[in-house]
Amino acid sequence: MELKETGADAGKDGLLIPVDSEVVRAWQVEQCPHRAEIQGIALIPSSSDDGFFLGSVDAYGRFIVTSLNSDIPGSSYTAGPRDAGVGEGWWAGIVFNRNVPSLAAVGRGFAKAVDVYDKDMHVRTLRTLQHPTCLTFLQGPLFDSGTILAVTEGPQLSIWDLRQAERGGCVQRMLGAFTGDSLNAIACSSEGLVAVGGAERVVMVMDPLKWTPRSRWTGCLKYEVTGLSFSAVDPGLIYVHGLDYEVVCAPWNREKTGGSNTPAFSFRGDSRWLGFDKCCDSDLFAGWSEAGTIYAGHVDGNADL
């Protein structure tokens, strides 16, 4: 993988040394009145114009969706859970449905619940067995309806169909971490494959036809996995980042690489990641480090970074 002339220099052992860069475009959120610590954010394009909607959720599960379009400034709508749960704030996450942008799912850790909303209208609540840690709507040929939600809860991966009433909507449940450690991340490929990872530093890729493990990549990082994303340029590659400052892009299927998970490329930031994410339809990624540095990169079809 070739590192082209961008806003960073290569240092020792894959460390990227940041340099000053000019911000081409930025949005300012005029109003985002959360009353508790923000736990998660999500971004989705607007279906009616070229703008974006930013969703943020606080530790109590109350979320705000804000329009980033200059023509429609300010907060769009806000909603919160119908029940107060245990009255304690903890992890919370929000994810939008790419097929139906108005549909959002909000996970609440202490409450062991996932609330589904259509804009600011509460649709239903899914009750998990353990504390949820990550959630996403599944995409791909097998999930054209856009109503299938995947949730990591403890060491388990649970699959939910929003159209089903039996068993509370849960259609499948499987063990994603054989050691019993918590799962922290989940990703879905364009082919419908589902990957999970967490504290045991293993990336497990599931076959959605039988919900059985298709591949296991052990010891992928030095510390526990906190984020996953399949490559849009090459579906055989997966991005993995962890609790420290490391990012690895490597093949997930060892059968096609002779039993090796040799990285296509990897790099380290200047300090621990506070946030890191990748676009769903391209290999454009960005991370924010504890030192206040923002890293951004793009891998094109020629395998140039």
Label every model-predicted segment:
Residues 3-9, 14-23, 60-81, 106-134, ...:
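Per-blade loop-tip surfaces of WD-repeat and WD-like beta-propellers in eukaryotic adaptors/scaffolds
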Residues 5-51, 88:
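Blade-loop segments of beta-propeller domains
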Residues 33-46, 83-97, 128-142, 172-188, ...:
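Canonical WD40 repeat/beta-propeller blade segments in eukaryotic WD-repeat proteins
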Residues 50-52, 99-102, 144-147, 191-192, ...:
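Short coil/turn segments that connect the beta-strands within blades of beta-propeller domains
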Residues 55, 104-105, 148-150, 195, ...:
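Structural core positions within WD40/WD-like beta-propeller blades
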Residues 275-305:
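Blade-level signature of beta-propeller repeat domains, shared across WD40, Kelch, NHL, RCC1
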